[in-house]
Amino acid sequence: MTKRRNEWLDWIKALIVAAILAIVIRVFLFAPIVVDGPSMLPTLENGDHMIVNKFSYLVGEPSRFDIVVFHATETKDYIKRVIGLPGDHIEYKDDTLYVNGDPIEEPFLQERLDRLSENQSYTFDFRLQDIKGNYKTIPENHVLVLGDNRNNSTDSRMLGLIPIDRIVGETRFIYWPMERFGFVD
């Protein structure tokens, strides 16, 4: 009888430890998210299931072109790409990103840009000053984010600059559907 009781206690302990580990991992390290909508096409598709790395920004800062998940509202998280960092002046002119006056390539958009006719624009011209807040440069602890599908994305052009403390984490790994399994550039 005692042996059977000890086995049950061992199983209960193991399950409690596993549950605690799962909660710690989910809350502090990694979380699943599902892409909702077309705002990150062609990079991410509606329904892509991804893993959010929450740990990356506990020890570091976002980098230009990171794909991040952030709290857009109390109940809704968005997935967008970091375009502008603290201290940057951002401008788009003729589908070219300028950071502090220097043109910067966006290789993840090249396929879409190549398909445009001469009189079409993929990213409408704007300057940082055109965004809510009328900033000359992005202030400390904020980033400017855009969706890769520039004509169909609710991003910093509408939401304003995103405080870094609202960023949940970085996402680069699709685990479902299986035909899209892998890392995203």
For each predicted feature, which ranges?
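Soluble "head" domains of membrane/secretory-pathway proteins
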Residues: 2-8, 24, 28, 42, ...
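Signal peptide cleavage region of secreted peptide precursors
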Residues: 29-36, 40
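Hydrophobic membrane-insertion alpha-helices, especially the h-region
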Residues: 13-28
